């Protein structure tokens, strides 16, 4: 079993670029495309660690979906971001959905 450092709905920062993001899904290992044999031997450690689907905002404030390795992300300790309220709202909405049980008919 692979343990992930971050959870769905959690706000994170891109370590290199500093962008704020919200995790919307987690893959236990890289899963966008099937790697070639050469790629497997070169990047096996990176591919076998968790990868995250993260929503971030571009320079114009438009949401964008990114796929990032765990090593590219850092914790975000600040809960509110006046300059990026939509990401705060997305994070809160996801966390509430995960905490609130749904009634199914």
From Swiss-Prot:
Give the source's domain of life in one word: Bacteria
Instruction: Answer yes or no on keyword Cytoplasm.
Output: yes
Sorted alphabetically, the Gene Ontology BP terms of this entry are: response to heat
Which InterPro entries does this UniProt record tie to the protein? Hemimethylated_DNA-bd_dom, Hemimethylated_DNA-bd_sf, HspQ
Instruction: Name any one Pfam family assigned in the record.
Output: YccV-like
Q: Which UniProt keywords are listed?
A: Cytoplasm, Stress response
Any idea where this protein resides? Cytoplasm
Q: Which GO terms describe its molecular function?
A: DNA binding
User: Can you list the GO cellular component terms from the UniProt entry?
Assistant: cytoplasm
* Job description of the protein: Involved in the degradation of certain denaturated proteins, including DnaA, during heat shock stress.
Record's family?
A: Belongs to the HspQ family.
Spell out the protein name for this chain.
Answer: Heat shock protein HspQ
Q: What is the lineage of its organism?
A: Bacteria, Pseudomonadati, Pseudomonadota, Gammaproteobacteria, Enterobacterales
């Amino acid at each position: 079993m692979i343990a992930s450092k971050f959870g769905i709905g959690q706000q994170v920062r891109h370590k290199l670029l500093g962008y704020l993001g919200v995790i919307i899904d987690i893959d236990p290992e890289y899963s966008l495309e099937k790697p070639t044999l050469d790629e497997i031997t070169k990047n096996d450690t990176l591919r076998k660690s968790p990868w995250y689907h993260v929503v971030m905002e571009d320079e114009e404030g438009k949401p964008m979906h990114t796929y990032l390795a765990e090593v590219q992300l850092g914790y975000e300790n600040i809960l509110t971001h006046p300059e990026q309220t939509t990401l705060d709202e997305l994070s809160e909405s996801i966390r509430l959905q995960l905490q609130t049980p749904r009634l199914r008919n």
